[in-house]
From Swiss-Prot:
A motif ('HIGH' region) lies at residues 46-56. It catalyses: 1D-myo-inositol 2-amino-2-deoxy-alpha-D-glucopyranoside + L-cysteine + ATP = 1D-myo-inositol 2-(L-cysteinylamino)-2-deoxy-alpha-D-glucopyranoside + AMP + diphosphate + H(+). This is L-cysteine:1D-myo-inositol 2-amino-2-deoxy-alpha-D-glucopyranoside ligase. It comes from Kineococcus radiotolerans (strain ATCC BAA-149 / DSM 14245 / SRS30216). A motif ('KMSKS' region) lies at residues 295-299.
């Protein structure tokens, strides 16, 4: 599956410091990526049935900041992202709207590509749909079965026999990604695609690895597994192991993926590659974006779509600036005021870098680098740019190179394009 075009990332003098990031599993700041060489990043992708709302954009912009900071520190970045282009919510939406699920997925992925391109998000090197990785995922399920780390469940209520599940008790580290208690995990499992009440499971938390074919559902041949399709969590695990190896430097996604998705994915990986654990050196989770006091979600329908904002005349750089003005781990609310503030800030910054000269900007570059290296503190970086812009407005300045350095700093590190 193709991704999208690579935005221009201006060159900057010098190099940034090593990045430290909040790790969900330990609850503290940890250095991420090597001091030299290649950093690896896996970010869970969309289920394509309502393309990019601001909650999505917040996540992919957040981890784009990480990739930019890594590259600025002199690292190569291997970045993989999936698309969950066959899953129950997608199939349900397709049936409800009378659209073929494949056409729905492709149309929404195309919108997503356009949104990411507009927001100047650097694309992953490998952008993979689950449909094109079914053989890979099925192989992982067969490997788990062969290792005694998977089991089949008989059908219920007239359903077919043979669904394959993963026994969470097989991984001694299960529960360490999110640190939730059993009651919370059971509630989140039921809320987020699990089936804790299914008869025949050894543990209510055990996740589905392979769903055998049901009438009217897409299915693929998978040898001893029979015709069927993958469960959600094993998809990302199999793709990440194939294209990044283990351990990954950072496994990332929205905070609603901590459990069950990332917890289960790590457990799968630990059983598939027991000598290479942990699955990831750090787990990073972005905050949720709300509208009218409620988290944006497809199920609630309270979505602000990036494509609609841009179609309404809002520059994509303004949308990105609104996002990076909020710390990547915080929950925040999209409002007209947030948009107005971002628009006004973008205008001030654009005017300042259009001037023939300004105050020296080397210290600003250093500050932006320091802020991003400290848990991707983009709001701190934005505040530093604001301070330089205000100084430029009140004192003018005589450094003819400064405006261009500020423009390149903002573009390269924050991903905000200034005209």
């Amino acid at each position: 599956m193709r991704s999208w075009s690579v935005p221009e990332v201006p060159a900057l003098p010098g190099r940034g410091p090593r990045v430290h990031l909040h790790d969900t599993a330990t609850g503290g700041l940890v250095p991420v990526g090597p001091e030299a060489g290649t950093a690896t990043l896996y970010v869970c992708g969309i289920t394509p049935y309502d393309a990019t709302h601001l909650g999505h954009a917040n996540t992919y912009v957040a981890f784009d900041l990480l990739g930019r900071a890594w590259r600025d520190a002199g690292l190569d970045v291997r970045y993989v992202q999936n698309v969950t282009d066959v899953d129950d919510p997608l199939l349900e939406r397709a049936e409800a709207t009378g659209v073929d699920w494949r056409d729905l997925a492709e149309s929404q992925v195309e919108l997503f590509r356009g949104d990411m391109e507009a927001l100047s998000v650097v694309p992953p090197q490998r952008y993979l749909g689950v449909v094109e990785a079914v053989d890979l995922v099925a192989e992982a399920v067969r490997d788990l079965l062969a290792a005694g780390a998977a089991y089949r469940v008989p059908g219920t209520d007239g359903g077919p026999d043979g669904d394959v599940y993963f026994p969470v008790d097989a991984d001694a580290a299960f529960g360490t990604v999110g640190g939730y208690d059993l009651e919370t995990m059971l509630a989140l499992s039921a809320e987020r695609g699990g089936d804790p009440q299914r008869p025949g499971k050894r543990n209510p938390l055990d996740p589905l690895l392979w769903r055998v074919e049901r009438p009217g559902e897409p299915a693929w041949e998978a040898g001893e597994l029979g015709r069927g399709r993958p469960g959600w969590h094993i998809e990302c695990t199999a793709i990440a192991l194939e294209h990044l190896g283990m351990p990954i430097d950072v496994q990332a996604g929205g905070s609603d993926l901590v459990f069950p998705h990332h917890e289960m994915g790590a457990a799968h990986a630990h059983l598939l590659r027991p000598r290479a654990r942990p699955f990831a050196r750090a787990y990073a989770h972005s905050g949720m974006v709300a509208l009218d006091g409620e988290k944006m979600s497809k199920s609630k329908g309270n979505l602000v779509l990036v494509s609609r904002l841009v179609a309404a005349g809002v520059p994509a750089a303004v949308v990105r600036l609104a996002i990076v003005d909020h710390h990547w781990r915080t929950d925040w609310e999209w409002t007209d005021e947030v948009l107005a503030q971002a628009r006004a800030r973008h205008e001030r910054w654009s005017a300042a870098v259009a001037a023939p000269a300004g105050p020296p900007a080397e210290a600003l570059l250093a500050t932006v680098r320091e802020r991003l290296a400290d848990d991707l503190d983009a709001p701190g970086a934005v505040a530093a740019v604001d301070a330089w812009v205000e100084q430029a407005r009140t004192t003018a300045g005589t450094d003819a190179q400064a405006p261009d350095l500020v423009r390149r700093t903002v573009s390269a590190l924050l991903g905000v394009v200034l005209p």
